[in-house]
Amino acid sequence: MRFSLHLLPLLGGLHSLTEAKPLDQPSVTFLSPSEVSPGSAHNVIIEYGGSADGELTITYDSCDGAALVSSAKQRLGTTHVGDHPLAARHVDHDNRRPTKFVWLAPTDASELVGQSENLRVVKRIPRRSAKRSFAEVAGDDSMWFNGVAYLEQKEPDESFVAAAKSKSFGILGAGMSGLMSSLLLDSVGIHNWKILESSERLGGRFRTVYLNGTSPEEGQYHELGPMRFPVEITDSETNETFPFNDQRIVFQLADVLNELNAGNESVQVKFWEWIQSSPNAPVDSPFRRPDGTFPGKAEVATDPAYANPTVYHNTTAAAEAIAALDKFKGLDAERIRMYATNIFAAYTQAKEDGMFDYSEVSYLRDVIKTDLNTTDEVTPSHIYWPMWEYETVYFLATKWLTVKGGLSRLPAAFEPLMKGRIQYGAKVNGLHYNENKTVSVSWKPTGSEPFETPEEVESFDYVLNSVPLNLLKFWDLPPYSSLLKRAVDRTLFGNAVKVIVQFKTRFWEHLEKPIFGGCTRLTKPQLGQVCYPSWDLNATGPGTMLASYLSDYEATVACSMSEQEHLAYIKKALIRVHGDVVEENWTGNSARHCWEQDEHHAGAFTMQIFSQQDLYLPAFYQTQFNTVFIGEAATFTHTWTFSALESALRGTVQLLLDMGLVDEAKQITNTWMARFIEAALPPKPIYQTNNQINQTIEAIRNCQINNP
């Protein structure tokens, strides 16, 4: 909407090294912005029409009087351009004359502004009047496009001149956050980036294994990393279905990659249904069927003969403890909907409710004063974790999707976009901040002789670091702030081990009570999660299942066994579960991955203990020594693909704001950062491609043309 109709100009004041003289012709013409929002950040783009050497000051003032820099209403900033000695900082710009500047528009700019062209002032979404940190802006309302709170922390002239897009960018790690960052940089015309990846593959923890030399199309695979995406949830009482809005970014990414790779079927990303729960999947029970096999989920739920209620030493105390936890978490229908439709609002609510201040154990012991034995009985696996219940809500999903042919096909779709801008086998061991404000990255070839092999050193203007924090404990690092040092040193990572096994047939689909897809959890024997494939149902020939997925301490014990010893245990356990049909179909073809022993990760996922997350997160949201931290550890949810992608969005926007590239930061947030997160918006189709996505695709295509 329009406000009042007075005119206010943007003024460029140029002070030369010698006597100041009036200019016969304007040396500067203002090209943009065409409209502004009061109290928000904008880029001011100018064009030099003549000689411009000296101190340049840009101001904002009324058109009613003389255009005097000294009496201007607002000074945007001052820098030096052209032949001035202090203009050497702008060597990356043509003739040392930058053309893009940062303007934090005043909150009372309720008028039209402009000089050659009028600037239309538009109403923006109301914001809190109190100054907020970038972490707070990003954390609760996703309004990163504004950027004001972050830029206000900087000295005015420090953030005044926008950096040139020709700067160099190092991206450490080719997991999903690193890959996403490269895509985002390309989309805003920044192409001078390079990924350093310690392994020989893309995808990080995305790790699909195709057994026995098969192809994705043959279906003989399973996931040793992430497996699926929650899509929607149906309220069992109202029958209302609503989406997991945060997960839509995964499908939006697939849309963009598919369009960029149009015509190359081998890297198209397609989705099909994942079956998370199956009625006949075996469940933990002390009881057995007449044939000695484990009963299924539906049998245990409906047959009284399989009833096995939990027994507590003090039933009343246990019930009170469980009720206290449920009340504190408050996961009613309304809260579940908020978690699904607006994860940012859910995070804010969780902070306000104190969910990060306690684990289940500490809450019961310190607040409710529950006795130790009862506490231990009702909280078997929640000693350290905060009560941030997003994963609980994820697993209430009634519809799931996975990538056809395996999740590794998603990072594989980035391969055609690399264009030689990735160094595989580069194991980083340190960062050094130089006097010229560049960052040197030291690395050695992965697997090289450790004592005599010299280090390689590459320097970048900026670094996006997605390497798991626990690996950084052994790096040489710049003198980061105390908070960031502690975040690196003390953030914990959980262990996990997955084992997939190929069988001669899909025998589980031919049992008396057939199993079609689905996951279950078995602790006696110690298999953890077992997942039957959701694809190629009723197919002939061999089949592959996730035979064991253990995490935390159980994974540590399992990984202490040799792979063959562990496989023998799994075979024996599956025979107990399904009977001799396992022996009859056993091939021995298998794969195991112990994530804690993986030299590129040293852990499976972040496990920040209670009180750590809200303490450490702001440290990641501050750029230190031209380095921005991204990855699932550096965001407010963990372990899921969304976490990695969201961190890349935040980190790239943070970097662009550091560089003063406000327009580019807006472009990314308006394209990706989810107006669909707001619960008030109606659901969008999962595979929507809008004009903003098309603009992103076109920008990246231009990069491909310029980088053959």
Model-derived regions, located:
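Short, compositionally biased P/S/T/A/G/V-rich stretches that sit at domain boundaries
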Residues: 17-42, 151-158
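Exposed aromatic-hydrophobic patches
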Residues: 81-92
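Conserved flavin/dinucleotide-binding core of flavoenzymes
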Residues: 35-50, 60-68, 72-76, 86-88, ...
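N-terminal glycine-rich phosphate/pyrophosphate-binding loop and immediately adjacent elements
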Residues: 160-321
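Mid-domain catalytic core of redox enzymes
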Residues: 424-546, 550
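Fungal secretory targeting signals
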Residues: 1-22
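Active-site/ligand-binding neighborhood in enzyme catalytic cores
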Residues: 320-439, 445-450, 459, 466, ...
